Amino acid sequence: MASAMRSLIEDDSRYLKSFKLFLERSTEHQCVQEFIHNVLPDILGSVGKGKTHLNVIGVGSGAGEVDLEILSELHSRHPGASVDNEVVEPSAQQLQDYKALVLQKKDLDYISFNWNKMTATEFEERWRANKMSKEADFIHMIQMLYYVKDPEATTSFFQSLLSKTGKLLIILVSGNSGWGKLWKTYKNQFCNPEISQCVTTADIQSFLDSKGARYQSFELPSQMDITECFTQGDEKGELLLDFLTEVLEFSKTASPELRAEVMELLRHPDCSVESNGRVMFNNNLGVIVLD
């Protein structure tokens, strides 16, 4: 990343603001929910067969909305089983929101929540240091592998925790998405070298293929309205640009040349389609399910 530009994740408040706006402007949650309710139940039906207690790990759980939907589907497939749910999330605000959501919900008596305010890497270090032997029946890592140094090693570690019938669910942006094109073009300019911000499911699949690993994969069509990005000085447009580039205050810190190039690419058919005066960015997600 160019020295004048800082990573968006260095400012938790602005990151959360831009992330919430991204969710409002995109069909991300809807397409993930459709997958959870229409495809995931059959996958969950095959985990922990006959067990009366299931171990779940949510890595990068955020504010918990998606976690609770997954746990609800798991419960419908294994109604008699109690669940031990490890929540791994480094943001204090997100964890607070998750806990508040749990308090609002009824019928969660079958779940015990273990709150881990830490990164995936810190969780792995603690797990290894304590020589934990507990196996997981289901692990989900949704939109979080961008924030680790080595996504392949993180994937391998969590896969190693699975029980015999356990499954690991990974959701990231698809290699065929606008993100894939954007990151391929500008990885060196605005991706933080300390983490793997520019990783897509195509990268993870290449790694798994090189190991000869078996997995299922799915593509989830999604769009994001980025029209506001093209109005100079628009506050929401600037937030969306920060989220797209993962650069803090991108419009103010990028050179005019880089900004112009990025804006041109965002409008390019490889990244977006224009419809009814709106610019709709290809936000397709990829899903990988590992045994």
Curated annotation (Swiss-Prot):
List the GO cellular component terms.
cytoplasm
Alphabetically list the UniProt keywords.
Answer: Cytoplasm, Methyltransferase, S-adenosyl-L-methionine, Transferase
Cell location: Cytoplasm
Catalysis performed (reactions): histamine + S-adenosyl-L-methionine = N(tau)-methylhistamine + S-adenosyl-L-homocysteine + H(+)
InterPro entries xrefs: HHMT-like, SAM-dependent_MTases_sf
Give the binding site residues for substrate: 28, 283
Q: Which SUPFAM superfamilies match?
A: S-adenosyl-L-methionine-dependent methyltransferases (SSF53335)
| Residues annotated for S-adenosyl-L-methionine binding in this entry | 60, 89, 94, 142
Q: Name one GO molecular function term.
A: histamine N-methyltransferase activity
Q: Which domain of life is it from?
A: Eukaryota
Identify the main location.
cytoplasm
Name a single GO biological process: histamine catabolic process
- On whether Methyltransferase is a keyword of this UniProt record, the answer is yes
Q: Write the Enzyme Commission number(s) for this entry.
A: 2.1.1.8
TM segment ranges = none
> Subunit structure, per the record?
Monomer.
Please describe what this protein does: Inactivates histamine by N-methylation. Plays an important role in degrading histamine and in regulating the airway response to histamine.
Family from the record: Belongs to the class I-like SAM-binding methyltransferase superfamily. HNMT family.
Any idea what this protein is called? Histamine N-methyltransferase
**Species of provenance:** Tetraodon nigroviridis
